[in-house]
Every structure is written in structure tokens, then in C-alpha cells.
Amino acid sequence: MNKDNHHIKVSLTNNPYEIVIGKNSLESIGDELFNIGFREGLKVLVVSNKEVSDHYGDCIIKSLIKSKFKPKLLIIKAGEDQKNQSSIDLIHNAAYEARLERGSLMIALGGGVIGDMTGFAAATWLRGVNVVQIPTTLLAMVDASIGGKTGINHSKGKNLIGAFHQPRLVLIDPKTLISLPSREFKAGMAEIIKYGVISDLELFDLLERQENIADLSNIKEKLLLEIIKRSAKSKAEIVIKDEKESGVRAFLNYGHTFGHVIENLCGYGKWLHGEAVAMGMVAVGQLAVQRGLWNEDNAKRQKRLIEKAGLPSNWPKLDIESVLSSLQGDKKVKNGKVSFVMPLKIGDVKLFNNISNKEIRECLQKIS
């Protein structure tokens, strides 16, 4: 175990685990698995996509073999349009071929899509096998890999099919961001800004003080580690309080309700998830201004930081009635009313369940 790695405990009652963050931590995956109780002869299915596997697949496999585990590597296509039952069938077929047992392990090596699909495949194979998340995108590092949400999309909406299935370990190696396309890095910054708005004013202020947060090459290693650690810790603290999203975990949906509509109506792939969330945060910021929940200055601060990160901030051209219809398909609708997480100030949000179509229509007309 690398003594330089940073450990964050996700202290759940039934399924506690750690988030391990550190440079070159990929090389110690075998040791990390041994440290949490896995032993010689363990059957492991590593699921990745070609781009990520070309960079890091060999490193993972060598570490697993060194620890006397029995790994198999499955390469599948990533991308939001691949997050479907057909991809799950591919993973399940590979699990069958690898003779995975209930004590076996799946490892998700990739971004949020790979993590979501592998997690869901693990949750549903043999009614649940172990899963480890090794996120290689910024968005997955600070959000998707932590908390046990897994799932796939349905033709009617994003993530409508899924399960809660906590990982045994989340291993984050910031060096994997070097191979990340610039647009993907910026998309991850949207989730980091989200944490600043919902719970961490100091993080928001830290990001505001930087000259450039849109380009990885301009962010010092120490700062990058600090941003990742603060964001992962924010996510972990919320998950510990509310594992199954019955209370404060809903705060993590800030910007996502509108964001999912953008992804759904524009077609998956048109906008990256983080880009859609960024536009969603600006939209719900305007909704909060309308309600008098926070002031125009805070809304402008949020929008400026989103733009500073190189993210889109203007609402796309969408038919308002189509937006209202799409919102009704959201998982968080209760009694026909759409729920929105809205900011009270930077660092504090609240869930509102009584948002009318009239308010939403007025908001969209204002920002369109």
C-alpha cells in the first residue's frame, strides 16, 4: 500500500469502503484488493473501453496477476448511447465465460458510463457480485464512482433502470487525466462546481481564485489533488448520511433535473453529461432568483465560474412544452410535481417539491 495515497472512509452501516486517491495508485490495485480481504485465486473481470484499456489495461492486469488473482479483460464500447441492456448482456456473457462466482469481482476501469454499466452488471449477476470502481475521468472520480448508484438508460429517459450497489473500493489515480480529452475534463469541472454550490463555499472560492480551471495543463498537481479530494469527500459525506437517496442525497441532483432533460431531448451524445449539468445549474439558478431564494449576484457568480471552466452556460434551443413533458418522466416526480434542488446561497441548497409548470415556463422563457 502506497503511504502517499489519501484515504477517505465511506462509513456505511452495511457496506463500508474506502476511496483511495494517489498518483500511480493504479500500480497498487492488487495490493489494495489484498488489503481489503481478497485472496489468491480470485476471479476478476475487468471491464473497460478500448481507449482507456490501451493506456492502463496492462498496468491493471499485471498488478492483479502479481497478487495471484485471475483476471480477464473485457473491452466494450463506451458513450452514453451504449448505456443499454445490450451492453449489460455483453458483460454478463463475459462473466459467465469467466465463471464468476458470488465472491468474485468486477472492476470498472473507465469513465462514468463504464462505471454505471459495470456496477449494474455486478448488481444483477448472481444477484450481486463484488465491484471495484477505478474511474479515469474527472467526472467519474468526483461523482459517478462514489455512492453505489448504477444503471442504464431507457428510451424514455436517462438512468431509469438501475440499482444501488456499493463498491468494495474506489481507486483514483489522477495521472489517468493526462489522457483525457479536454472537453471531458471540462465536463468533470461541472460536478466540482456543483459541490461548491451545494455544500462547500471554500471549494467554490478556491476555484474562483484560479486564473484557469478549464485546462488541465494549467492546474498544478497539488491543486488538482486538493480539488479531487474535497469533491470526493463532499460526495462521501452526503452518501454516508443518506445511502438510498431518501433525504439529503437528493442535493447531489442539483442541476441534473434540467440537465437530464437536455440530454434526453437533444439526444445522448450531443452534450456531455457535465455540460448538460452546467446548463442545468444556470437554469435552476434562475429559478431560484425568481423565487427570491438567492440573489442575482450569486446567480451571476455561478454562471461566471461555469464559463471560466469552459462549460456552456446558455440554455439550448428546446421547445418549452417538450421540456415540461420530459420533466414529468423524471425519477424524482411526486404526484405530478417536479422536484428541484435550489440554492439558498453558495454552499447551501434545499429541495423544493412544489414547482409549477408556470414557474418553469417563466424561467425557460427568461433564459432562452
Swiss-Prot record:
Tell me one GO biological process term.
Answer: chorismate biosynthetic process
State any single GO MF term. Answer: 3-dehydroquinate synthase activity
Q: Which CDD domains match?
A: DHQS
Q: Which GO terms describe its cellular component?
A: cytoplasm
Catalytic activity annotated for this protein?
7-phospho-2-dehydro-3-deoxy-D-arabino-heptonate = 3-dehydroquinate + phosphate
* Cell compartment(s), UniProt: Cytoplasm
EC number(s) per entry: 4.2.3.4
Keyword terms, alphabetized = Amino-acid biosynthesis, Aromatic amino acid biosynthesis, Cobalt, Cytoplasm, Lyase, Metal-binding, NAD, Nucleotide-binding, Zinc
- Domain of life assignment: Bacteria
Q: Which residues form a coiled coil?
A: none
Q: Which residues bind Zn(2+)?
A: 191, 256, 273
Is Nucleotide-binding one of the keywords?
Answer: yes
**Pfam families assigned:** DHQ_synthase, DHQS_C
What is its pathway? Answer: Metabolic intermediate biosynthesis; chorismate biosynthesis; chorismate from D-erythrose 4-phosphate and phosphoenolpyruvate: step 2/7
Report the cofactors: Co(2+); Zn(2+); NAD(+)
Q: How is the cofactor bound?
A: Binds 1 divalent metal cation per subunit. Can use either Co(2+) or Zn(2+).
Q: Which InterPro entries match?
A: Dehydroquinate_synthase, DHQ_synth_AroB, DHQ_synth_fam, DHQS/DOIS_N, DHQS_C
Q: What class of enzyme is it?
A: lyase
Q: Which family does it belong to?
A: Belongs to the sugar phosphate cyclases superfamily. Dehydroquinate synthase family.
Cross-referenced PANTHER family, in alphabetical order?
Answer: 3-DEHYDROQUINATE SYNTHASE (PTHR43622), 3-DEHYDROQUINATE SYNTHASE, CHLOROPLASTIC (PTHR43622:SF7)
What role does this protein play? Catalyzes the conversion of 3-deoxy-D-arabino-heptulosonate 7-phosphate (DAHP) to dehydroquinate (DHQ).
Q: What is this protein called?
A: 3-dehydroquinate synthase
Give the encoding gene's name: aroB
